[in-house]
């Protein structure tokens, strides 16, 4: 057997072994979380954001991408908004796109399975990282379980799936980066490029927080490797340049793959308020969180004992409990020789100080003023980095214990016993974060087609997209219902809102508001009788009213009486545009009650026509006399450059890999 055949056989064995490891992670994940699959009694889609954001937005994403059309604009919520601009929609996350292509329009069951695949990826990535750090196969699996089966990571899956998905890329980023740094030319190693791709995916998954904290941890890890992997005989300057150039490669690759998201979100946030549930919303590009908000969701000093009691009063998954089994193993891990334990302890201490926020003086004051960290609204969200460090120590501790057992079968038996006890503890103390499939707050129950929804659908079919529904309170119909059912709502559930739309509604929130007339709020769902409205029907205690003064979404400016049939004809709604036929005996201004936003274009009878931008709220255009076809389309400037950046990033990664193969031969 020649050297080439030996190399091929060796590679084949490694690939086969790693595929088996990945399948084992998948199997263990599905066994541990079996209640989400069979028999399906629990679901991850029970938290408010998962039910009312993640589920309907995945519907919108699937509907558009399955038609090979990027989901650029959402007509169904508020007066329309740029769908990718609100980055929690994860409109350009490749895994979501591939999944809906393969499985179709998502159901709660399908999304639970997608979340489980990410759990398995987290476990596998953690195992790879730990094995790279010298931990054996079975303890590395245990470390992967500690990282994601309980604690801040698992809790986030039930509350905000898009944040959870971003968290799981942390071990992958560090694993790829360490492998890249071991290459001869770290800055052009394909492993370093993959670290940049993994970091980019943590942003594309739908939230900036994992990207910020993953980047922070990568920086800490790079400094650690600078000292641990320093090449003897080389100056500090050369070693520093080696690490810095690798980080630069990661940054460039990450930028190329996230550019499309960053560009769309920057354009949107420049025109939006953030945290609209607050009494005084802030401009979305105000990246530093107000101090009173920053100190609202943090750990308290008594919460520190949750490491063994499991009880914490902190919101947002602010717990230190990762089971007694893992705690004992982590204590053993502190006895493992080497510098990693000191690095893990140092990072853990830093993370706890940040999570305590205003409860520590003066560090809380200092942490609030640290760049990047003060961009995250809830300091406790950084605790998954504590969980990561804890998991590495637990895996090292189990490794040390297994090293004392000479028989291979004995080591495997102890591993099975330890991970089984850990799984029982995690199920007992972590399963309460799941929601029962019978809960009215789950996506299964919240988006059932009720008689009220059916009635509103029928009204919408009579005038497609011409009027909107207002619910008071807004949860009387599921927020973002328009992404699932054919209807449009005045309000949705998002953390931000376009300033022009917010300011328009804020003029008068009463049901007789002229602002509601302007946005086309014709139907009102309420739980209390309302004077001055036309009663239509009642549905299970909910009252449906009609607002006769509501203007249609398409109308003639300044003349409500001329919006009848024969003047504005059939409206054909498309995924990122709308076409309509109109007829008028003189030139008139046609108003489209959709928010005036960059990227909209109009053609009248095939001729490009300027949009009147004097009115900041809605769009209008002057149409000539006679019969005309008006075509509105949303084509943002950043789409083509963003796709080109994706392509360029893929080309660079491919070139890196081919270069490595040539050097090897």
What are these regions (language model features)?
Residues 277-283, 420-585, 591, 595-597, ...:
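Extracytoplasmic
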Residues 35-133, 138-169, 286-294, 302, ...:
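Active-site lumenal/periplasmic loops and adjacent helix-entry segments of GT-C-fold
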Residues 30-40, 65, 94-109, 138-160, ...:
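Membrane-interface helix-loop junctions at the exits of transmembrane helices
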Residues 14, 230-245, 329-362, 408-409, ...:
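Membrane-interface helix-loop-helix junctions at transmembrane boundaries of multi-pass membrane enzymes
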Residues 25-28, 121-133, 137-228, 243-265, ...:
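Membrane-embedded helix bundles of polyisoprenyl
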Residues 51-69, 81, 250-333, 375, ...:
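Periplasmic/ER-lumenal interhelical loops and adjacent helix-loop junctions
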Residues 54, 491, 551-665:
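Active-site-proximal, structured, solvent-exposed surfaces of multi-pass membrane proteins
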Residues 1-36, 238, 242-251, 411-418, ...:
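Start-transfer (signal-anchor) and selected internal transmembrane alpha helices
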């Amino acid at each position: 057997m020649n050297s080439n055949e030996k190399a091929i056989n060796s590679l084949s064995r490694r690939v086969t072994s790693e595929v088996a490891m990945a399948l084992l992670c998948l199997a263990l994940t599905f066994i541990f979380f079996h209640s989400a699959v069979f028999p399906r009694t629990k679901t991850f889609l029970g938290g408010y954001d998962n039910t009312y954001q993640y589920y309907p937005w995945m519907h919108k994403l699937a509907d558009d991408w399955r038609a090979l059309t990027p989901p650029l604009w959402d007509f169904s919520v508020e007066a329309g908004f740029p769908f990718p601009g609100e980055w929690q929609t994860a409109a350009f996350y490749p895994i979501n796109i591939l999944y809906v292509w393969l499985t179709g329009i998502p159901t709660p069951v399908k999304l639970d399975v997608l979340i489980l695949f990410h759990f398995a990826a987290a476990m596998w990535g953690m195992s790879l990282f730990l094995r790279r750090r010298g931990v054996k196969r079975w303890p590395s699996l245990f470390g992967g379980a500690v990282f994601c089966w309980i604690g801040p990571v698992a809790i986030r899956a039930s509350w905000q799936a898009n944040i959870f998905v971003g968290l799981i890329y942390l071990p992958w980023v560090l694993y790829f980066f360490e492998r890249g740094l071991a290459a001869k030319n770290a800055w052009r190693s394909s492993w370093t490029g993959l670290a940049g791709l993994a970091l980019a995916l943590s942003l594309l998954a739908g939230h900036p927080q994992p990207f910020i904290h993953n980047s922070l941890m990568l920086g800490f890890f790079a400094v650690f490797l600078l000292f641990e992997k320093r090449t003897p005989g080389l100056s500090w300057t050369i070693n520093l340049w080696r690490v810095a150039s690798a980080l630069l490669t990661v940054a460039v690759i990450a930028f190329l793959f996230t550019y499309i998201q960053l560009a769309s979100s920057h354009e949107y946030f420049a025109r939006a308020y953030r945290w609209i549930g607050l009494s005084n919303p802030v401009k979305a590009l105000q990246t530093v969180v107000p101090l009173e908000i920053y100190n609202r969701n943090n750990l308290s000093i008594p919460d520190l004992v949750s490491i063994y009691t499991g009880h914490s009063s902190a919101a947002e998954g602010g717990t230190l409990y990762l089971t007694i089994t893992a705690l004992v193993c982590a204590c053993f891990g502190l006895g493992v020789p080497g510098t990693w334990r000191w690095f893990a302890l140092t990072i853990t201490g830093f993370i706890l100080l940040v999570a305590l926020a205003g409860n520590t003086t003066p560090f809380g004051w200092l942490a609030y003023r640290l760049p990047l960290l003060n961009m995250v609204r809830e300091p406790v969200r950084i605790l998954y980095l504590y969980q990561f460090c804890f998991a590495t120590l637990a895996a090292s501790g189990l490794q040390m214990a297994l090293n004392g057992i000479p028989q291979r079968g004995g080591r495997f038996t102890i591993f099975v016993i330890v991970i089984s006890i850990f799984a029982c503890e995690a199920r007992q103390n972590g399963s309460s974060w799941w929601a029962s499939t019978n809960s009215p707050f789950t996506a299964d129950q919240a988006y059932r087609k009720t008689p009220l929804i059916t009635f509103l659908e029928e009204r919408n079919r009579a005038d497609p997209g011409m009027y909107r529904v207002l619910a008071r309170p807004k949860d009387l119909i599921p927020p973002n219902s328009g992404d699932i059912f054919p209807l449009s709502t005045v309000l949705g559930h998002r953390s931000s809102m376009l300033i022009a739309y917010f300011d328009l509604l804020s003029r008068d929130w009463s049901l007789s508001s002229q602002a509601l007339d302007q946005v086309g709020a014709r139907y009102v769902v309420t739980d209390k009788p309302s004077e001055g409205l036309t009663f239509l029907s009642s549905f299970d205690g909910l009252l449906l009213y009609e607002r006769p003064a509501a203007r249609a979404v398409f109308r003639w400016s300044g003349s409500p009486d001329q919006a009848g049939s024969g003047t504005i004809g059939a409206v054909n709604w498309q995924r990122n545009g709308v076409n309509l036929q109109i007829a008028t005996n003189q030139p008139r201004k046609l108003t489209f009650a959709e928010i005036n936003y960059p990227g909209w274009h109009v053609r009248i009878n095939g001729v490009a026509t300027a949009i009147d931008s004097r009115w900041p709220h809605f769009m209008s255009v002057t149409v000539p006399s006679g019969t005309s076809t008006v075509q509105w389309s949303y084509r943002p400037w950043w789409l083509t450059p963003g796709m080109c950046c994706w392509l360029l990033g893929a080309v660079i990664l491919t070139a890196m890999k081919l270069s490595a193969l040539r050097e090897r031969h």
